[in-house]
């Protein structure tokens, strides 16, 4: 069992996923969160939520407590999610195929870097593939721009997500935040032997062009370079056991919304999201028809790539 440490011994306490001894308090908090309860009733009980909002929230709270009454660990929570994934696959996909996972050592932690088409499902499909293969699930990198509500933060961190800083102000603050993130990634891979999933770029590829941002590669190796200033970049990459992962969906449930955003950026130069647009995209991605889904795991990138651009190109090639 994992346990919570005080901040000095736990330097990543504010960005890391929740641990087993934090599960019970988090679930209690979620079952009493009025914003979460209102959001659930709007989607599952729309008429009742309009007519008797207090009753609908009470029912939602009771449902959360009933569904999670035996959940006392992160693993148990994810086992519940696996059941929902199975149901989602049956109702919204025609086929789910996985290639390449059998070539990776089940006892080794990897830093999976993947293309990004869906806010929640890209890492969810990676996790489900690992779950079906009897392997440990990944810790998921998620931008703090998605964590605008406390209940969203709780749900994500309960599902083994860690926080990527995007809202830090000022160059110095951003560098400190990214160094902290880089050190956590290294700690997870090398000390905890726990795999990670991270997107190849900031935000989804709304235009369908999957291209790795070299800045992501620089961030990943910051901690290694801080300890070994003259070490080649390839050494840090090899130590992280970086493995490209690609996912493709036959149909994208969010294609209209993505096209609308691209059109606005093209014509107006910017796009302003509505308050709950990301949440709506998550729901649409989960419930919408996806057709055939194909997930492919690549091979670990070795130390022969000596620049962030070269590493990014190899990720894109695979």
Tell me the role of every PLM-derived stretch:
Residues 81-306:
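Soluble catalytic domains of membrane acyltransferases
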Residues 1-110, 116-127, 131, 153, ...:
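Membrane-anchoring hydrophobic helices of lipid-metabolizing enzymes
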Residues 308-318:
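Long, compositionally biased intrinsically disordered regions
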């Amino acid at each position: 069992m994992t346990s919570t440490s005080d901040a000095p011994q736990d330097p990543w306490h504010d960005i890391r996923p929740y641990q087993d001894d934090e599960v019970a308090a988090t679930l209690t908090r979620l079952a009493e969160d009025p914003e979460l309860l209102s959001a659930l009733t709007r989607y599952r009980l729309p008429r009742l939520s309009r007519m008797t909002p207090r009753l609908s929230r009470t029912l939602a709270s009771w449902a959360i407590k009933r569904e999670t009454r035996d959940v006392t660990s992160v693993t148990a929570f994810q086992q519940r999610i696996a059941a929902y994934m199975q149901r989602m696959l049956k109702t919204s996909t025609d086929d789910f195929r996985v290639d390449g996972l059998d070539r990776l050592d089940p006892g080794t932690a990897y830093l999976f870097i993947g293309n990004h088409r869906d806010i929640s499902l890209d890492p969810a499909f990676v996790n489900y593939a690992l779950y079906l293969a009897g392997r440990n699930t990944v810790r998921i990198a998620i931008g703090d721009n998605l964590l605008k509500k406390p209940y969203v933060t709780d749900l994500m961190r309960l599902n083994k997500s860690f926080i990527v800083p995007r809202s830090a102000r000022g160059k110095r603050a951003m560098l400190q935040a990214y160094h902290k993130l880089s050190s956590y990634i290294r700690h997870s891979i090398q000390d905890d032997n726990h795999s990670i999933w991270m997107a190849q770029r900031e935000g989804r590829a709304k235009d369908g062009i999957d291209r790795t941002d070299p800045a992501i590669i620089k961030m990943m190796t910051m901690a290694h370079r801080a300890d070994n200033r003259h070490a080649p970049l390839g050494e840090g990459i090899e130590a992280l056991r970086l493995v490209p992962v690609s996912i493709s969906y036959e149909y994208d449930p969010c294609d209209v919304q993505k096209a609308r955003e691209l059109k606005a950026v093209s014509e107006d130069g910017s796009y302003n999201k509505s308050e709950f647009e990301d949440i709506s995209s998550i729901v649409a991605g989960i419930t919408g028809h996806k057709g055939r889904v194909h997930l492919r795991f690549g091979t670990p990138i070795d130390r022969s790539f000596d620049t962030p651009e070269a590493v990014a190109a190899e990720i894109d090639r695979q």
